[in-house]
Structure formats: C-alpha cells, structure tokens
Amino acid sequence: MSLYFNADTMRIERSSVHEPKRNRNVFLDVKPIADDANVNVPPRQAARRNATVFNNRVGFPPLTPKEAFVDAVPADQTCMVFESSKPIYLVLRAIGVLPYTRLPSGGTAFVLASPSMTYCVLFFLLLTVYIAFILLNRIEIVRTLEGRFEESVIAYLFIVNILPILIIPLMWYESRKVVSVVNGWVDFETVYRETTGRALELRLRTKAQVIAILLPILCSLSVAITHVTMVDFKLLQVIPYCVLDTITYMMGGYWYMACETLSITAKILAEDFQRALRHVGPAAKVSEYRSLWLRLSKLARDTGFSTCYTFTFICLYLFFIITLSIYGLMSQISDGFGVKDIGLAVTAFCSVGLLFYICDEAHYASFNVRTNFQKKLLMVELSWMNTDAQTEINMFLRATEMNPSSINLGGFFDVNRTLFKSLLATMVTYLVVLLQFQISIPDEPSAMLMHSNSSHS
C-alpha cells in the first residue's frame, strides 16, 4: 500500500502495488466517447460499466469527484485545431482547392454531392478556360522568339508557372485524407481534455488570419512586379497568374499551420507530462500520456500521407522554378542586370523561401514530437516511482523508438532540412552543367566573324 498526492482532486489517495493489472492497451483507431454521450444510461448500469471497462474510453479511469461537477464542453471547443486554422481552410475552399463540408455535429467531411464541391468544380473549369487562352498566347510568343535560350527564360517561365493548376485536382483526390486528419485532431483533443481536465489551447488563430490575408496580397504583388518588367505586359493576363501563385503559397501556408500545430501540441504535451510526473501514483497516468503521444505521432505521419502527391508535385515544381530562374539570372552576368531580371530575382527568392519553410517546419515538428519528448523521458527520475510506473516509463521510451514521427510524403521522401540541402545540391549541379553548355556555344556575332574570315581565306 502506498500513498500519493493527486493534484487534480487535491486529495491524498492510495494505491496498492499488488493490485491486479488492468488492460492498458492503446487503440489509436478507436474514436473516444465523450462524457455526455451516456446521459440516458441508468446509474446502476453506468457504474457497473465504469468498474469493468473504464467508461469505455481508451484506457482511462472513470471520472474523479472533481470532474463530476464540471459542465460539458461546448461543441465549438472540441475542434480547436480546426478553428485555429479555419481562415486558411476558408481561403483554400474559396480558390477551389479544398472542398470540405462542416457537419452539424461539429465534424468535417468530404462529400462529392455538396455545394462546396460544386463551387470548386465551377471555379476550376472557369480558371482552366481562362488559362487555356493565355497558354495559347504564351506559346505563340515563344515561337516568335529569336536569340539564345537564356535571353528568353522569362517567356518559358510564364509557361511553367501555369503548372500549379494541377494542385487543384490533386487536392480533390486527397481531400478525404485531409478531412480524416482534421477529425483525428478532434479525437485527440477529446482524449487530451479527458486526461488533463482542460482544453487544448494553441493560440494560432492570429497567425492563420495574417497568413490568409497577407499571402494573397504578396503573391499578387510579386506577379505584378514580374509582369511589369516584361515588354508584352497585359493586365488581363495577371489575374490567373495571381490565382495560381496564391494556390501554391496558400498550400505552403496550410503546411506551415499543420506543422506548427504539431510542434506546439508536442510542447504542451511534454510540459503536461513533466508536470504530471511530480505526483505520479498509479501507473495509469503514464499510460494515458503514452496513448496521447501515440495519437500525436500518428497525426504527424498522417499529415504527410494526407497530402503526399500534392506536396511532392509542389516540391518538384519549386525545384524546377528555382533552377530556371537562377539560370536566367546567372546567364546575364556578362551583359549586366536589367529591368527584366527583377522578375527572375523575385521569383527565385520567393520559391527558395517557400521550399525552405516547407522543409524546415516539417523538420521542426518531427523534432518536437519525437526527439524533444524522448529527452523529457530520459530525464525522469525513476528511483522514487513504484514498479508499475517505472515499467510504463520504459514502455513509453520503447514506443517513441518504435513509432517514427517523421513527416513522410507517401514513402517518397522525408520532409526535413536534409531534403532542402539535397535539392539545393542537385540544383547547383544542374546550373553548373547548363552554364558550361552555354559557355561552350559561341555568340552569333563571333560565329559570323569566324565564318567571314574563313570565307575570305
């Protein structure tokens, strides 16, 4: 028999070392049942069920006397993650990328026969028709170009900039997985609230609002700068390019918010776990945090898998844009920079920044979910804990080793800083080859002079 102080109930409770071990298996695919789901159950039947299966939750004990007097949590507080990123979701739906539907129960769903899907399809068809006319015009401009390739990089770049329209159908294909991740966060918040007694507070709403407002403005500004520096500037051609750039960078904003949510949640969970270890009695408390961490680790993996094809395409597209833009800039070094090179510089800078943030935020989220949590576990003092608690701590450490928390794009590659370094190294290799190929080709005036000299001789 051992005594310990429970900070939640403010009482000294006792636990027996020789008590029979209850089943603490963690089922990550089981949806937790809210406390108010069993209002009509008779008291005797509810008490019998609580005594046997812990109120049918995922390894959690029944309510404490303190929690019995807590009011039910409002529905809008059970999906704080969605509410924090809601401005970005609204912008993505407005530009036809993410046709999600909010259910009356508070969940999120992807329904083909829904008003949001109909709007996204109509928006995509109108944008496709608009871009088709612009593409024909751009192809005609490329055909009439004369001179070397490096002198017409911007014209080719405008054709490549049409490719982000493929993001829309790719996201439609993956919207069901994205919605599943959003609902997974709702389940995580439910389990977190039942474990800690309070709601998950992220405080990311302001960041999401800033991203949703500033990114479309900055994208439109960069596209306008690029078009103004062109000789054949046409105002009507700026609008679809602004939409396409907004789609690309708003997907970057979505990725940033997803990774930032993982990072902040991992930090909060680590602090709560460290605070709970100060008064650990039964080993069930450690088991509860282990189940929470396993859910968070699964959410980190699902974040990458849910948009694997979309962000694989975005990374390859950004790599191609960066290579083409920097090649156009470096090829003009001998002739000096002009006004038209401003657009190339802006495009290269923005693309490098977006690619860096995609890789860096995923790296930071993976570090906080796994490595930072392992440090907290390794710093735990086990000498004063009972045997069951020590066993649960060791099982927790083993779980962090066996469950990878890296954000992986469908098995293609891990998104981290190593990916950014590899892409830059490959880009430098391509640039060196292209510049050597350019140097080996003589200019037209020198070629004509050599031809005239040979004819005179």
Curated annotation (Swiss-Prot):
One of its GO terms (biological process) is signal transduction. It comes from the Eukaryota. Residues 137-152, 231-237, 331-341, 443-457 are extracellular. Its main location: membrane. It is found in: Cell membrane. One of its GO terms (molecular function) is olfactory receptor activity. Keywords: Behavior, Cell membrane, Glycoprotein, Membrane, Olfaction, Receptor, Sensory transduction, Transducer, Transmembrane, Transmembrane helix. One of its GO terms (cellular component) is membrane. Pfam families: 7tm_7. Glycans are attached at residue 453. Residues 1-115, 174-209, 259-309, 363-421 are cytoplasmic. Carbon dioxide-responsive neurons coexpress GPRgr22 and GPRgr24 in the maxillary palp, at both larval and adult life stages. The chain crosses the membrane at residues 116-136, 153-173, 210-230, 238-258, 310-330, 342-362, 422-442. InterPro entries: 7TM_chemorcpt. It is a multi-pass membrane protein. Gustatory receptor which mediates acceptance or avoidance behavior, depending on its substrates. GPRgr22 and GPRgr24 together are sufficient for olfactory carbon dioxide-chemosensation. PANTHER family: GUSTATORY AND ODORANT RECEPTOR 63A-RELATED, INVERTEBRATE GUSTATORY RECEPTOR. Belongs to the insect chemoreceptor superfamily. Gustatory receptor (GR) family. Gr21a subfamily. This is Gustatory and odorant receptor 24.
